[in-house]
Amino acid sequence: MVQPDSSSLAEVLDRVLDKGVVVDVWARISLVGIEILTVEARVVAASVDTFLHYAEEIAKIEQAELTAGAEAAPTPEA
């Protein structure tokens, strides 16, 4: 019988900080059609280096989308 590899808490924490974890929560509580409570949360756990790397990549994607949208929009003729 093969034992699965066990990981220590330090190894798990190192992996989470290296790769990053995002937990996105959206919940609504209502009673008889009346909204009582809405919760929206996004929790990000990552090292600063990992966060900055992915923030740069997201900025590049958003800039490419803006550029593509500007090129596709018709220009008004005078």
From Swiss-Prot:
Write out the ranges of the annotated region (Alpha helix 2).
48-67
Superkingdom per UniProt = Archaea
| Claim: Endoplasmic reticulum is one of the keywords in the record | no
Main localisation: other
Induction context? Transcription is controlled by the GvpD-GvpE pair. Transcripts are maximal at the beginning of stationary phase. Gas vesicle formation is maximally induced in stationary phase when grown in 20-25% total salt (NaCl, MgSO(4), KCl) (at protein level). Expressed from a single promoter upstream of gvpA; most transcripts stop at the gvpA terminator, with low read-through into downstream gvpC-gvpN-gvpO. Expression starts in early stationary phase and is maximal in stationary phase. Highly expressed in 25% salt, poorly expressed in 15% salt, no gas vesicles are formed at 15% salt.
Return the GO cellular component terms, semicolon-separated.
Answer: gas vesicle shell; vesicle membrane
Write out the annotated subcellular location: Gas vesicle shell
Q: Where is this region: Beta turn?
A: 32-34
> Sorted alphabetically, which InterPro entries does this protein's record hold?
Gas-vesicle_GvpA-like (IPR000638), Gas_vesicle_GvpA (IPR047870), GvpA (IPR050530), GvpA-like_CS (IPR018493)
Report keywords, A-Z. Answer: Gas vesicle
**Region (Beta-strand 1) location:** 23-31
- Residues of the region (Beta-strand 2) are 35-43
Region ranges (Alpha helix 1): 9-19
Can you name one GO molecular function term for this protein? structural molecule activity
Which residues form each disulfide bond in the chain? none
Q: Which family does it belong to?
A: Belongs to the gas vesicle GvpA family.
Q: What else is known?
A: Encoded in a 14-gene locus called mc-vac.
Q: How does it assemble?
A: The gas vesicle shell is 2 nm thick and consists of a single layer of this protein. It forms helical ribs nearly perpendicular to the long axis of the vesicle. Modeled as antiparallel homodimers.
Outline what the protein does. Answer: Gas vesicles are hollow, gas filled proteinaceous nanostructures found in some microorganisms. During planktonic growth they allow positioning of the organism at a favorable depth for light or nutrient acquisition. GvpA forms the protein shell. This gene replaces p-gvpA of H.salinarum very poorly, only about 1% of GVs are formed; the few gas vesicles formed are quite strong with a very high critical collapse pressure (CCP) of 0.213 MPa.
Concerning PANTHER family, the annotation shows:
GAS VESICLE PROTEIN A1, GAS VESICLE STRUCTURAL PROTEIN 2-RELATED
Record's comment describing the protein's domains? Infrared spectra studies suggest the major structural elements are 47% alpha-helix and 25% antiparallel beta-strands; it is thought the beta-strands make the hydrophobic interior surface.
The entry's protein name is Gas vesicle protein A
The gene name on file is gvpA
